[in-house]
Amino acid sequence: MPRTPHLLAIQSHVVFGHAGNAAAVFPMQRIGINVWPLNTVQFSNHTQYGRWTGQVLPPEQIPALVDGIAGIGELGNCDAVLSGYLGSAAQGRAILDVVARIKQANPRALYLCDPVMGHPEKGCIVAPEVSDFLLEEAAAVADYLCPNQLELDSFCDRQPNSLADCVEMARSLLARGPRAILVKHLNYPGKAGDTFEMLLVAADQAWHLQRPLLAFPRQPVGVGDLASGLFLSRLLLGDDLRNAFEFTGAAVHEVLLETQACGSYELELVRAQDRIAHPRVRFDAVRL
């Protein structure tokens, strides 16, 4: 029987609803991953509600929790680290120390950085020190980097004029160290208004994926967290880059279809769980 992969997921958590680990952990488990959730913040709900309660995890707790895992002899079983929303730059540096420690224990372990800064329609939502950390430090360590358009623009200090520009910008990030760049949400002049587009770029390949853009009264939160988690999970389960990319696009679309059908603001992960594991739709990525 194949071994079940283990993944350390270090990002935000909400008690109510789905964002950060609350959006990613269950779907990753549902498709066959043992997830170790480590929450950088614990809030009552996501911040787009306009009010919330909760607190940021002190940075020193991150290595302390990993010490506990090492103490029971399990650290070498970690196959990947996923990082997302950070409450502070100090948290980010603690995560990079953890990544180095895990890679020492398991040299094959992967690190996917979801450089959460904000959203093209909402602007930057993190402190400048967090943005600086992601731009200047995290990208050099990540095996996979998963920005949205705002974050890609921030990394490259420019905005695209076309899809070709987006490819060029993503490819320029490979020089910093990542094996591949997954742009989870493209937005560029000339883009069709009725499609949602994603981009995957590696040294020897570039793939473009389009799916229908679904309308919501309020855009659900956590879609990017879901996408990053599914993409890394499928890589751990043996998919190549293209297949992991196509699976991610299909599974996320299935969740959004269920969410739209229910008239929900929060992602309908539980109702869509079988469609996450076995998407009924598939969108073919086009090689560029």
Curated annotation (Swiss-Prot):
Gene Ontology molecular function, alphabetical: ATP binding; magnesium ion binding; pyridoxal kinase activity
Key words of the record: ATP-binding, Kinase, Magnesium, Nucleotide-binding, Transferase
Cofactor(s) the record lists: Mg(2+)
Binding site for substrate: 12, 47-48, 225
An example Gene Ontology CC term for this record: cytosol
EC numbers for this chain: 2.7.1.35
UniProt xrefs under Pfam families: Phos_pyr_kin (PF08543)
Annotated GO biological process: pyridoxal 5'-phosphate salvage
Residues binding ATP, per UniProt: 114, 151, 184, 211-214
Enzyme class at the top of the EC tree: transferase
Catalysis performed (reactions): pyridoxal + ATP = pyridoxal 5'-phosphate + ADP + H(+)
Pathway(s) the chain acts in: Cofactor metabolism; pyridoxal 5'-phosphate salvage; pyridoxal 5'-phosphate from pyridoxal: step 1/1
Protein family (similarity comment): Belongs to the pyridoxine kinase family. PdxY subfamily.
Oligomeric and partner information: Homodimer.
Function of the molecule: Pyridoxal kinase involved in the salvage pathway of pyridoxal 5'-phosphate (PLP). Catalyzes the phosphorylation of pyridoxal to PLP.
Protein name: Pyridoxal kinase PdxY
Organism encoding this protein: Pseudomonas aeruginosa (strain ATCC 15692 / DSM 22644 / CIP 104116 / JCM 14847 / LMG 12228 / 1C / PRS 101 / PAO1)
Lineage of origin: Bacteria, Pseudomonadati, Pseudomonadota, Gammaproteobacteria, Pseudomonadales
